[in-house]
Amino acid sequence: MLFGLQKCFGAGGGSCVVILSPKALERAEKIKRQRKIPFSFDLSEAARYADLHQTFNTPSTTNIWLFNEACKWMLANGAIEGMDRLCRMHAQFLEEWALKSGYLMPLVEDKLFRSYTSYTLKITDPALQANDINRALAATGLFNLQDGIKAHPSAPENSLRIACFPFVDPHGINEYERLTKCVDYVVSQLKNNHR
């Protein structure tokens, strides 16, 4: 299992946690015997260093500290079940907002298959473009909107992706209420300009 620290744990990018079973380590060794594996991608070397309580690359200590702080907070606030509830609460709010908006719908129609950690909304109003919304959000000058709301590279072009991670709003939906009001305002201004 491999997971990045920058998503649900709120740490900076470029760091990850790798959890390997003994069987996975055996496969890594077998592959290493069959072909050349670059040192930085060699899981058997990573495991060897881990057994020595060392790293074979100098990690970002800030990310390790942030990861540890996030884990402590998560454990104190419901652990996995609590974080699951929080992410689902964020996603539920976004779904309800999108369905009331008149210009958004969840990209994945079947609720069973929707991600509740990274929620993608398709823009249903043909007069609206995600790029225009993003530029307008960036122009607000609000720090957390300086990049707008980017779609995932593999998602359809005219869509918005909003993170539902625990640390976006660790206390509920207040940050999502602010964000959606801002998006609604920007969209209303864009629609007025198109008239």
Describe each model-derived feature in a short phrase.
Residues 166, 170-195:
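Structural signal for terminal/edge beta-strands and the immediately following C-terminal loop/tail
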Residues 26-30, 76, 100, 127, ...:
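Polar/charged alpha-helical tracts
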Residues 99, 103-174:
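Conserved C-terminal alpha-helix-loop-beta "cap" of PLP-dependent enzymes
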Residues 77-86, 103-110, 147-152, 190-195:
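Flexible, glycine/charged-enriched surface loops at secondary-structure junctions
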Residues 20-23, 36-39, 138-142, 182-185:
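Short, low-complexity, polar/charged sequence segments that are solvent-exposed and flexible
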Residues 62-72, 92-95, 131-134, 138, ...:
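Predominant activation on well-ordered alpha-helical scaffold segments within soluble catalytic domains
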Residues 6-96:
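Active-site C-terminal subdomain of aminotransferase-like
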